[in-house]
Amino acid sequence: MEKWWFNSMLSNEKLEYRCGLSKSTDSPDPIENTSGSEDRVINNTDKNINNWSQIKSSSYSNVDHLFGIRDIRNFISDDTFLVRDRNGVSYFIYFDIENQIFEIDNDQSFLSELESFFYSYRNSSYLNNVNSSYLNNVSKSNHPHYDRYMYDTKYSWNKHINSCINNYILSGSNNYSDSYIYSYICGQSRTRSEHGSSSKQTSTNGSDLKSSNVLYVAQKYRHLWIQCENCYGLNYKKNLKSKINICEQCGYHLKMSSSDRIELSIDPGTWDPVDEDMVSLDPIEFHSGEEPYKERIDFYQRKTGLTEAVQTGTGQLNGIPVAIGVMDFQFMGGSMGSVVGEKITRLIEYATNEFLPLILVCSSGGARMQEGSLSLMQMAKISSALYDYQSNKKLFYVSILTSPTTGGVTASFGMLGDIIIAEPNSYIAFAGKRVIEQTLKKTVPEGSQAAEYLFHKGLFDPIVPRNTLKGVLSELFQLHAFFPLNPKKIK
């Protein structure tokens, strides 16, 4: 059995017991151990690992140290923290009594069943009697590892939760079937000895249980977590914007709204949108069997707060005046219809007349089928305006390809930049993988439409991470003789 050792990484000020934590939850860095009088077990890693091997015969687990805190009443009400094992695998643990939530990330089946224990705990009289229980019981316990902050009234519940976490981690959850986790947490008659080879056992309803739990958790807790498309790790929603939508687990660049991208690139207080009131009038009166086109437009307008799939305007980037258009994939997949094409064309013409550098951020599924040939016309219209801007006026255009950039956008202005920048791991293609495979009856190699692969084929210039993009753009503009209005704004 592989042994594990926990280190607290992200915590809040309440988690100061034993570990001597000196950082707050605002810091993403690992918390250093600064206490000189730590608990003997915490201080000695080797001894601690030996204790893990004796967990079956011990009534006390080292996960108690994880929950050992100075004020459990504050902690248990609403708290989120992260623990990491010696191999670097991270686990989120989230408590919220008011909303009846107890979360442990990495196994949805484990999480779902563990919640039921938390609900019964929350509905008990613990919160009403916690102070008196503590005073009555703190002197009664003679347990050698008794923690005076873990009250006897619910110590058995706490011990059960700790035991669940212990066995979940020690089992190396990927090596054990869902039926094992399910039966253990639910207190079934089946014991661990009966699962000596549980990694090889299967359950008739195991896959159904896992699928239903994944769907249940994804729906119920989506207001708290965003799941990474690459590593499937969970990112705390409140912290994601400050991380510019980059996964904390693997560094994958998640999708961003157009408003967030504008906020990232444009100096505060300088954004001036144009053509905000331009909306589609359903030019070909397209109607599908499911939902009229006009109703779909109205739905996405309410959902995103935008009038169309692109925001255009002017602003300053490190003091340099620029014209910028940012597509939003959340609005009908960023599809390019007549309004999107018209707004981008007008922006290019304005930049041409004002001699401004131009940025277009692409995130689109291609031309909008609900507008037929009118949407296809936008490709030629935008390309024509760019020809005048680049070839006749000799101005500077930067296109930024984000995930996904496909279809008519790739075939027109997306690939016409003087400098073409791609975000890491972006999906960039003309036709999607499924369309190619269904049309040509051939398998598309995995990763052949990823930014890194296409970069080595010379399809675009640099791959620039989000956190350095603004600085790179600023240097490119100055290299092409576009300078800040106020030199002090150069970063």
Curated annotation (Swiss-Prot):
Ranges of residues in domain CoA carboxyltransferase N-terminal: 224-491
Cofactor(s) the record lists: Zn(2+)
Main localization category: plastid
EC code: 2.1.3.15
Superkingdom of origin: Eukaryota
Family (UniProt): Belongs to the AccD/PCCB family.
Function: Component of the acetyl coenzyme A carboxylase (ACC) complex. Biotin carboxylase (BC) catalyzes the carboxylation of biotin on its carrier protein (BCCP) and then the CO(2) group is transferred by the transcarboxylase to acetyl-CoA to form malonyl-CoA.
Subunit structure: Acetyl-CoA carboxylase is a heterohexamer composed of biotin carboxyl carrier protein, biotin carboxylase and 2 subunits each of ACCase subunit alpha and ACCase plastid-coded subunit beta (accD).
Name of this protein: Acetyl-coenzyme A carboxylase carboxyl transferase subunit beta, chloroplastic
